[in-house]
A protein has these predicted regions:
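Extended polysaccharide-engagement surfaces of secreted carbohydrate-active enzymes
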Residues: 1-106
Length: 106
């Protein structure tokens, strides 16, 4: 998300690439492991890697005055986490320079 042409939320990027970074040990690096990002730990479980684990109901809308990004994180966790729904919503009110963050979960 941007405000007045400046980024409000950024990604720190990747570490230096090497063979291990593209191996089965990829998720031992902090830059790609979910426990070093702003993802919740649900009932002791972190988000899992792989195409099987993904957020759903991902949407983004934008107008001159407001930008909104919403997703349901439940699908990114193993069944053992026992999460039915975990909706995260970010709303940027551009003219007021306010970023509103909310989460609802079951």
């Amino acid at each position: 998300m941007y405000a007045d042409g400046e980024p409000l939320i950024i990604d720190v990027g990747a570490l230096a690439y090497n063979a291990k970074y593209f191996s089965k040990d990829r998720y031992t690096f902090w830059a790609v492991s979910s426990d070093y990002h702003n993802t919740p730990i649900i009932n002791g479980f972190i988000q899992k890697e792989g195409i099987k684990y993904a957020a759903t109901s991902v949407s983004a809308q934008g107008t001159k005055n407001k930008g909104t990004f919403t997703l349901d994180l439940a699908g990114a966790y193993p069944v053992e986490a026992a999460v039915i729904s975990w909706t995260r919503k970010l709303s940027l009110y551009r003219q007021r320079n306010i970023l509103y963050f909310s989460e609802t979960y079951i």
